[in-house]
UniProtKB/Swiss-Prot annotation:
NCBIfam families: L21. It comes from the Bacteria. Keywords: Ribonucleoprotein, Ribosomal protein, RNA-binding, rRNA-binding. This protein binds to 23S rRNA in the presence of protein L20. GO terms for biological process: translation. GO terms for molecular function: rRNA binding; structural constituent of ribosome. Belongs to the bacterial ribosomal protein bL21 family. It comes from Shewanella baltica (strain OS155 / ATCC BAA-1091). This is Large ribosomal subunit protein bL21. InterPro entries: bL21-like, bL21-like_sf, Ribosomal_bL21, Ribosomal_bL21_CS. Part of the 50S ribosomal subunit. Contacts protein L20. PANTHER family: 50S RIBOSOMAL PROTEIN L21 (PTHR21349), LARGE RIBOSOMAL SUBUNIT PROTEIN BL21M (PTHR21349:SF0). PROSITE patterns: RIBOSOMAL_L21. The lineage of its organism: Bacteria, Pseudomonadati, Pseudomonadota, Gammaproteobacteria, Alteromonadales.
Length: 103
């Protein structure tokens, strides 16, 4: 059984027991969180596709940790002008473990 849900403007395909990194959520470590924006639920035999959301669909997850991703380096450069600018960015994330998928 798997589901596709939306969080942080992105869609994630998950199954029970999977660990997923999401955009930072203001939830304490160890707490459970419910995602009700479920777009699709498949249980092996049938596929329930929402229009746009599955009615009564819910994905339950437990917050494992918070952290920051790998550094992304941004370089801006102007040719022949002795001008360059180097910046870096590390995105915050929340890691969750999927505990249940309810149709």
């Amino acid at each position: 059984m798997y589901a596709v849900f939306q969080s942080g403007g992105k869609q994630h395909r998950v199954a029970e027991g999977h660990t997923v990194r999401l955009e930072k959520l203001e939830v304490a470590t160890g707490e459970t969180i419910e995602f009700d924006q479920v777009l699709l639920i498949a249980d092996g035999e049938t596929v329930h596709v929402g229009a746009p959301l599955v009615a009564g669909g819910k994905v339950v997850a437990e917050v494992v940790s918070h952290g920051r991703g790998d550094k992304v380096t941004i370089v801006k450069f102007r040719r022949r002008k002795h001008h360059d600018k180097k910046m870096g960015h590390r995105q915050w994330f929340t890691e969750v473990k999927i505990t249940a998928i309810n149709a």
